[in-house]
Amino acid sequence: MFTRRIINPLDLPGWVPKTDISDPKFSGGLKKGAQTWSEDGSAQDCQIQSLTEEEILKGHVYASSWPSMFIGGYSDHIRIVRVIPSGSEKVTILAEWLFEKKTLENKKYNKDNVINFAKRVMEQDAHACELNQKGIHSHPYKNGFLMPEEYVIKRFHDWLRKQL
């Protein structure tokens, strides 16, 4: 795709929007009936009190803080993930879950429902990253050129080199 200067499926010839399909893989958001990012999709009757109904229905909000932090806001919790370099090709992933005090005091609330789901997703993401890293070291791999759209990555790489 990159050799044809396509960085988004929308750029593909013949691409058709699927705006009339509510499946989250096309529209984003949570699966039908889900309230949060958890094993069973349930917020277990514990939602962050300051959220509006619209924010709760949206399901999640994401933010990134360069160079290495990701924040996910959900109806019942917030998850902060930090990627910390621990070597030239190794990182440590730190994940923190923030819950309202009232949620943690609720004896019926099972935070493992949230944590186990996110841990599984992070393990799957880590596996995909490891496969990509292996590919970089394979013999057929040849460095390419960055496209203009990728210069934010180049700026990050330049910043990282200065820090080392």
Model-derived segments and their meaning:
Residues 1-164:
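C-terminal catalytic domain of Rieske-type non-heme iron oxygenases
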